[in-house]
């Protein structure tokens, strides 16, 4: 277990290593050449994680939570006469819809139940019927439940019908192998405090260069102007337009080095996947059932159904916190659930200790 007051079993912010925390003990200037060079290195490393066709893509770092980066994409990429199709089966897909509505972007929704993946057949029907759609957005890992959505099929469809593809990979990038060139993703969005195991403070967009260049002058916000942010970073050696989170960037750079040391995304995926399978197997032994079908389940976070009407999540939460663990409440409307994440600096021994603690506090007949 990492040295910490408790272990975060959440989808981010998450438990970070001691070495990631330690680099934040120092202060840096945003104009320093060494710092800006580090920003450029971070941008390049992210592209190399995302695809082998590195020359076709670029990275934009954006201050704020991951949602800021999603909104930067929605508000900058879609022109005034554009129309967005959003595939949603959870809170984060709904949030994209809300962004589009707030920004007065024409939006249509493909909705499935929260425990079911995006329906590719329905998506194609919508694309066939509505020729005005220009962009399609989907959440890869919907952390509302932990479900994985079929981005391969949806992006393939998007390109078949000539659409720009936007993927919210907030809780999957760095933990699940993705080649955005192979998948034909034009814009992929993620955040520092997810599978790369940094801390909160900025998100990032990995964009296809030729699509990003079309975004100039389209932004509906000054601070969330994706093109202007990129142009400044690109032309001024990693400079941010406005004050950047220097401590967070250094922590993220350290986290990237640690990802490489672990063996890259494939090795990290294997650790997360082993954590998740161990978690489910041990939770089943003490009477808890996962919400999502195994074939759609991500290695990121798992939703468990309340076992009985008498089950008291708040009591379990408080008991686990006293034992050094923090888990997540449920976030769906039709079924009572709670969620346990297994990303971050979390290992098999941590999962075993967690379930031992749950078993101690809950007796299920």
From Swiss-Prot:
UniProt-listed InterPro entries: Aminotrans_V_dom, NH2EtPonate_pyrv_transaminase, PyrdxlP-dep_Trfase, PyrdxlP-dep_Trfase_major, PyrdxlP-dep_Trfase_small, SP_NH2Trfase/AEP_transaminase
Example of a GO MF term: 2-aminoethylphosphonate-pyruvate transaminase activity
Quaternary structure, from the entry: Homodimer.
N6-(pyridoxal phosphate)lysine: residues bearing it: 194
Catalytic reactions of this protein: (2-aminoethyl)phosphonate + pyruvate = phosphonoacetaldehyde + L-alanine
EC annotation from Swiss-Prot or TrEMBL: 2.6.1.37
Keywords for this protein: Aminotransferase, Pyridoxal phosphate, Pyruvate, Transferase
Identification of the protein by name: 2-aminoethylphosphonate--pyruvate transaminase
SUPFAM superfamilies per record: PLP-dependent transferases
Cleaved signal peptide residues: none
Coiled coil: none
Annotated PANTHER family: 2-AMINOETHYLPHOSPHONATE--PYRUVATE TRANSAMINASE
Keyword Lipid biosynthesis tagged: no
HAMAP family (alphabetical): PhnW_aminotrans_5 (MF_01376)
